[in-house]
Amino acid sequence: MNFINLQAQYLAYKDEINAKIESVLSSSSFIGGTKLNEFEQNLAHFLGVKHAIGCSSGTSALYLALRALDIGKDDEVIVPSFTFIATAEVVALVGAKPVFVDINLSNYNLDFKAVQKAITPKTKAVIAVSMFGQMSDLRALEEILKDKNITLIEDGAQSFGASFKGEKSCSIAKISCTSFFPSKPLGAYGDGGAIFCHDDEISKKIRILLNHGQTQRYKHEFIGINGRLDTLQAAILNVKLKYLEKELDKRQKLAQIYNANLKNCQIPQIDPNAFSAYAQYSVLVEDRASVLQKFEKANIPYAIHYPTPLHKQPCFSEFSNLELKNSEYASEHILSLPFSPFLSEEEQEQVICIFKD
């Protein structure tokens, strides 16, 4: 059994993917070009946004978002502590201060009341992570921020394809970012990501920054990075994008089976207004150590997303005295189960059996 069965996915689309790879290899056009342009247009159409910009990873997408907003020294950016490190890492990389706040245990996303309490005159942005594939009510969060000159950024690394009240993840915030890491709902065969916005000037600046700050060849207006999405990944992702909604439907069905059959754990709590992309299927278990022993004895893969909240990480030691009870509880009790659109009925039953004792 695989935690995420990427091989089965490849075999399902093998002929199309191989043809696209061969097309790129034959063209000898590996950076930029029509394949990348086509993918970006398809992304924008899928979300209903004006601008979709392919980039080298979800991390570079977040970094470029902050750079495009001129966030830096003496600025503060509010982030959740229960998330992958990239969300806060990029804040530190641009010279700003990450301000860690707690989450709701219902959806593992930002606690909006905690966000309100954390706002200071130095707050320039809030990065809202759509954890495990479920969005928060970003319109409600926008309402909190709108009169304070604070920009909302969605970290939709895990939620591409999700929606809230019919509005898709990565289509609402001033700038939204996603990841195409292989395990994500829309995954590449390597690293990749994208940035989404409706603002022409922000889009223009991001495109300059991700290409070493060049406004024309060898003329560098800004200190930028190599943040480009390569053409080969764009071609592969373009194939997978066609099947995303079909895969999302399968994720819903598999999640419903887990929901109906898992015992002795807290299953994901999905808001009635939300459609989750179920990037992971994660549960809370009271005695995680004993459950993990059962998984290991049965040779069933699992993951812990995430074992240490960011304010307890060594690289953020200056925040170690913070008490963020929900983030700490989640890190101690969270467990991600084998899950992908290609999880078989037999494999899922093996996982369910672990929780029956």
Where are these regions (language model features)?
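Hydrophobic residues in well-ordered beta-strands that form the structural core
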Residues: 73, 79, 100, 152-154, ...
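Short beta-strand->loop structural element characteristic of the AMP-binding/adenylate-forming
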Residues: 97-107, 303
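Conserved coil-to-alpha-helix start sites within the AMP-binding
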Residues: 83-88
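Active-site phosphate-binding strand-loop segment of PLP-dependent enzymes
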Residues: 106-188, 196, 336
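PLP-dependent aminotransferase class I/II
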Residues: 7, 36-42, 46-52, 113, ...
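Helix C-cap/helix->beta junction micro-motif
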Residues: 94, 147-148, 298
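N-terminal "arm"/small-domain region of PLP-dependent enzymes with the aminotransferase-like
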Residues: 1-29, 34, 298, 338
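Phosphate-binding glycine-rich loop
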Residues: 28-76, 90-94, 100-102, 167
